[in-house]
Amino acid sequence: MLPRLSFNNVSWTLLYYLFIFQVRGEDSQKAVPSTRTSCPMGSKAYRSYCYTLVTTLKSWFQADLACQKRPSGHLVSILSGGEASFVSSLVTGRVNNNQDIWIWLHDPTMGQQPNGGGWEWSNSDVLNYLNWDGDPSSTVNRGNCGSLTATSEFLKWGDHHCDVELPFVCKFKQ
């Protein structure tokens, strides 16, 4: 036969467990780091990265070197539609509307892969998100370095010869 529990014993037992769970809940909340990213002045945060627009015109290689002066910095790689919209909002209205913007996309095969299959992010991020402004392999004067096209409000990708000088967006950790 089970011992008979009084109302008083049950109440104290419940209070004890509520107290233990409350204390554990507070401790676990303190251990979780903040997901907010603080970026330097002139830069804006998206997820865990900072982004900055540089309006100084540079070649693709020189632009990436300039971005590397920031912590883990490089030209921007755009991995989702949400990130594309964010970068578009960062750039729109801040550069000459006829100028494209360098991004970290390039074709190391120099156009040898059919259907634009040689394009990749320079850090080897998987190219799952595609947003070409037309087929990059079909243009007569195609380049091997990627850009955001001004005609698409900086949402779609284009290609240029890598020595063309354009403004650019850097993506970096803070």
UniProtKB/Swiss-Prot annotation:
<feature type="domain" description="C-type lectin">
    <location>
        <begin position="46"/>
        <end position="171"/>
    </location>
</feature>
<feature type="propeptide">
    <location>
        <begin position="26"/>
        <end position="36"/>
    </location>
</feature>
<dbReference type="GO" id="GO:0038023">
    <property type="term" value="F:signaling receptor activity"/>
</dbReference>
<feature type="disulfide bond">
    <location>
        <begin position="39"/>
        <end position="50"/>
    </location>
</feature>
<dbReference type="GO" id="GO:0042834">
    <property type="term" value="F:peptidoglycan binding"/>
</dbReference>
<keyword id="KW-0395">Inflammatory response</keyword>
<feature type="signal peptide">
    <location>
        <begin position="1"/>
        <end position="25"/>
    </location>
</feature>
<keyword id="KW-0929">Antimicrobial</keyword>
<feature type="binding site">
    <location>
        <position position="106"/>
    </location>
    <ligand>
        <name>Zn(2+)</name>
    </ligand>
</feature>
<keyword id="KW-0964">Secreted</keyword>
<protein>
    <recommendedName>
        <fullName>Regenerating islet-derived protein 3-alpha</fullName>
    </recommendedName>
</protein>
<dbReference type="InterPro" id="IPR050111">
    <property type="entry name" value="C-type_lectin/snaclec_domain"/>
</dbReference>
<keyword id="KW-0479">Metal-binding</keyword>
<comment type="function">
    <text>Acts as a hormone in response to different stimuli like anti-inflammatory signals, such as IL17A, or gut microbiome. Secreted by different cell types to activate its receptor EXTL3 and induce cell specific signaling pathways. Induced by IL17A in keratinocytes, regulates keratinocyte proliferation and differentiation after skin injury via activation of EXTL3-PI3K-AKT signaling pathway. In parallel, inhibits skin inflammation through the inhibition of inflammatory cytokines such as IL6 and TNF. In pancreas, is able to permealize beta-cells membrane and stimulate their proliferation.</text>
</comment>
<keyword id="KW-0862">Zinc</keyword>
<keyword id="KW-0011">Acute phase</keyword>
<feature type="region of interest" description="Sufficient to activate EXTL3">
    <location>
        <begin position="102"/>
        <end position="117"/>
    </location>
</feature>
<keyword id="KW-0732">Signal</keyword>
<feature type="binding site">
    <location>
        <position position="120"/>
    </location>
    <ligand>
        <name>Zn(2+)</name>
    </ligand>
</feature>
<dbReference type="GO" id="GO:0045617">
    <property type="term" value="P:negative regulation of keratinocyte differentiation"/>
</dbReference>
<comment type="function">
    <text>Bactericidal C-type lectin. The lack of the EPN motif may explain its inability to bind peptidoglycan.</text>
</comment>
<dbReference type="GO" id="GO:0008284">
    <property type="term" value="P:positive regulation of cell population proliferation"/>
</dbReference>
<dbReference type="GO" id="GO:0006953">
    <property type="term" value="P:acute-phase response"/>
</dbReference>
<dbReference type="InterPro" id="IPR001304">
    <property type="entry name" value="C-type_lectin-like"/>
</dbReference>
<dbReference type="GO" id="GO:0043434">
    <property type="term" value="P:response to peptide hormone"/>
</dbReference>
<dbReference type="GO" id="GO:0046872">
    <property type="term" value="F:metal ion binding"/>
</dbReference>
<dbReference type="InterPro" id="IPR018378">
    <property type="entry name" value="C-type_lectin_CS"/>
</dbReference>
<dbReference type="GO" id="GO:0005615">
    <property type="term" value="C:extracellular space"/>
</dbReference>
<dbReference type="InterPro" id="IPR016187">
    <property type="entry name" value="CTDL_fold"/>
</dbReference>
<dbReference type="GO" id="GO:0090303">
    <property type="term" value="P:positive regulation of wound healing"/>
</dbReference>
<dbReference type="GO" id="GO:0061844">
    <property type="term" value="P:antimicrobial humoral immune response mediated by antimicrobial peptide"/>
</dbReference>
<keyword id="KW-0430">Lectin</keyword>
<dbReference type="GO" id="GO:0070492">
    <property type="term" value="F:oligosaccharide binding"/>
</dbReference>
<feature type="disulfide bond">
    <location>
        <begin position="67"/>
        <end position="170"/>
    </location>
</feature>
<feature type="disulfide bond">
    <location>
        <begin position="145"/>
        <end position="162"/>
    </location>
</feature>
<dbReference type="GO" id="GO:0010838">
    <property type="term" value="P:positive regulation of keratinocyte proliferation"/>
</dbReference>
<keyword id="KW-1015">Disulfide bond</keyword>
<dbReference type="InterPro" id="IPR016186">
    <property type="entry name" value="C-type_lectin-like/link_sf"/>
</dbReference>
<dbReference type="Pfam" id="PF00059">
    <property type="entry name" value="Lectin_C"/>
</dbReference>
